[in-house]
Every structure is written in C-alpha cells, then in structure tokens.
C-alpha cells in the first residue's frame, strides 16, 4: 500500500507496531488560526466575552485535546505526554487569533497528532465561546510546523516543498 503504515499487506487498517522502536524525546509544534469579525476580536482582546475568559478556557481545552487524541483518532497510540504548552497570539490585522501548541513526550512514536488535535480543540473552543456573536468565524491553516526526535529525524515546515 505504497508507504501508508496504517495498512497491512492485505489493505486492512491496523495500529502500527512501535514495540521495536527506540524511545527518544519527541517534540511537535503545530499552529492554526481563527479569523473573526473585528467586534468579536475586540471582545476576546478586552476580556468582555459573555462566556468568560475565552483564551483561558481555550488553553485548557487544547491541553485536554492533546491528552485525549488517542480517544479521537482510531489508530493513534495512547501516549504519556510530558509537556503541552499552548500559546495564543492576537492578530489585530487579521483580525483573529493564532494558536501554537508544543507537545512533548519520551517514547516510541511522535506527537504530531497530539499537537494538531490540541490546536483544533483550542480553536474550536474559541468558536464555541464566541459563536453567539459571530457564526462566520473561520478556522484555517492548521499544520505541523516542526517535529523533533525519532528515526526520521527533525523536520521544519520551511524545509518542505509547497
């Protein structure tokens, strides 16, 4: 099946066996953005959203998302995460919010899925908390920006084509 590791020779989905892989420090950084109306951005920036501290709640949700990734992605290994750091960057020019998540573990498989899930859950929480005033918000540009560790080595998005 041409390099797709989640399928066996017969084409059936399976969880990849990582038992023989060496344990190493694994780090992944993912990023995403939510665009919104200027008035919605002002509510978040000024801490005046009716549901409370939007970014504070979204930060906790993102951490929870990283921890629950294996429950959501069927073939993803459950991992003992050693660190999840969530940062939000307010962007007046957009207007919107960028979410950057760094996830770390010491194990046999990477944490890219945990970082991506954390970004999505954090941004979905922003949407949920602000949808009463702005149903047109758009979550966009969610991607892995960097990964470190493991057999395949280090990688940065700027190293990729496209």
From Swiss-Prot:
InterPro entries: MoaC, MoaC_bact/euk, MoaC_sf, MoCo_biosynth_MoaA/MoaC, Mopterin_CF_biosynth-C_dom. It catalyses: (8S)-3',8-cyclo-7,8-dihydroguanosine 5'-triphosphate = cyclic pyranopterin phosphate + diphosphate. The lineage of its organism: Bacteria, Pseudomonadati, Pseudomonadota, Betaproteobacteria, Burkholderiales. The active site is at residue 128. Substrate binds at residues 75-77, 113-114. It comes from the Bacteria. CDD domains: MoaC_PE. This is Cyclic pyranopterin monophosphate synthase. It comes from Burkholderia orbicola (strain MC0-3). Pathway: Cofactor biosynthesis; molybdopterin biosynthesis. Homohexamer; trimer of dimers.
